[in-house]
Amino acid sequence: MNKKYIMAIDQGTTSTRAMIFNHRGEVVSKSQQEFSQIYPKPGWVEHSPDEIWVSILGVMSGALRSKGISPKEIAAIGITNQRETTVIWDKNTDEPVYNAIVWQCRRTTDICQELKNNGLEDKFKEKTGLVLDPYFSGTKIKWILDNVAGARQKAKNGDLLFGTIDSWLIWKLTGGKVHVTDYTNASRTLLYNIHELDWDEELLDILGIPESILPEVKASSTIYGNTVPYHFFGEEVPISGIAGDQQAATFAQGCYEKGMTKITYGTGGFMLMNTGKEAVTSDNGLLTTIAWGLDDGIYYALEGSIFNAGSAIQWLRDELDLIEDAADSEYFASKVEDTGGVYVVPAFTGLGAPYWDPRARGIIVGLTRGTNKNHLIRATIESLIYQSKDVLMAMVEDSGLDLKDIKVDGGAAANNLLLQFLSDMTGSRVERPINTETTAAGAAYLAGLAIDFWTDQEEVLKIRKVDREFNPDMSGEKREQLYRGWKKAINAALSWSKT
């Protein structure tokens, strides 16, 4: 039977999806399944690795059945995943020793603080490109080994394995034959030296983590192993692509040149700028990460995030009752030509890069008697772009690169007013793709390239279809004037936290 399709598994924070792509890069079938969020204590977040695995089996079956596709028609499988989330399991029994500790979980704050107090922050950043934060996998592994009865001894005996979600899924899909991850996921663990491309012995020693539990690190596009027939409907299918979710989206968006940037607007906003084969160290609190690793080498990226993007629009809907649906925000914002001098700084949970002030709080400034709800809605939309510009300017400053095209995806990318303002404020062309399922597409492309389903990245670029382009339509003088106003508003939010 003709191998006509690539299956992408997109294992996210709240749901698991399987999507089947044809040779034209189109989604021909998909299936989605939510799973439980576990909150044992305030600030703690866990998932059940076994429940995630069951959801994988469910969505793979669902995607095939939905359109009557035979498993024999699947040429390869690609995996993209929520990053940093940590699983440790017994390799002899396949049983997790503890729930997966999710990237959002803050339980290792004290461990990170102790490492900072011991003067180790610069060492970790220099080697891994990351900051000492509970977000990343390293301190989560330490917590499990220190707090689960017998775990540390089992690890010393060589009985335990660690993996981010991609590793756990490949282990299960291959029947326990393959323990592997890719460069993108390894670069999010706080244990991987992104310059030497190896697990860092010194950092492992500091955290008390035996190297024997770690997966082999491979390229993002290569054959890692085959599914065992009893886990893929009687078929052995190569698993040939892996990337963390943000890197997969960046790859799918065709950000293959230095200076190209991807922004995903979800609850927050994730920005990755391709810096080529050079790992750029940030002086602005950005992360240095691996964008992907292919046959022609390792490509690096700067990563920055804003805490409140879609959540700011939800605030208009849920707390202020100014709109009934998030999609209404563009309609009301378009009723006014500008914000009337109003700025909203949605620092509900502090400010991220490049300010890094967890105590900053949200403010609204510039109100007059003529301010109406449309001005407030527009100012909230524009705040997403001002925050994005802050991060993008930090990337430009750190890298010395010119800002090239910006590729946008995520829920808020449907808002034309938002994307036009992004183009105006950055002076860059902004593209929105037809296929906004970019994380899954990235995994599919990486898997397909490894088996020559697609010949090269040029072919991938050709099948990527753009829905709409947005080009700058604002004078430089106006742009600077508006941005100066934003900086004043930011300073007010920062000074509020200090009073």
Swiss-Prot record:
ATP binds at residues 13-15, 267, 310, 314, 411. Sn-glycerol 3-phosphate binds at residues 13, 83-84, 135, 245. Pathway: Polyol metabolism; glycerol degradation via glycerol kinase pathway; sn-glycerol 3-phosphate from glycerol: step 1/1. It comes from the Bacteria. GO terms for molecular function: ATP binding; glycerol kinase activity. Glycerol binds at residues 83-84, 135, 245-246. ADP binds at residues 13, 17, 267, 310, 411, 415. It catalyses: glycerol + ATP = sn-glycerol 3-phosphate + ADP + H(+). CDD domains: FGGY_EcGK_like. Keywords: ATP-binding, Glycerol metabolism, Kinase, Nucleotide-binding, Transferase. Activated by phosphorylation and inhibited by fructose 1,6-bisphosphate (FBP). Pfam families: FGGY_C (PF02782), FGGY_N (PF00370). PROSITE patterns: FGGY_KINASES_1 (PS00933), FGGY_KINASES_2 (PS00445). Its EC number is 2.7.1.30. GO terms for biological process: glycerol catabolic process; glycerol metabolic process; glycerol-3-phosphate metabolic process. Key enzyme in the regulation of glycerol uptake and metabolism. Catalyzes the phosphorylation of glycerol to yield sn-glycerol 3-phosphate. Homotetramer and homodimer (in equilibrium). Belongs to the FGGY kinase family. This is Glycerol kinase. It comes from Halothermothrix orenii (strain H 168 / OCM 544 / DSM 9562).
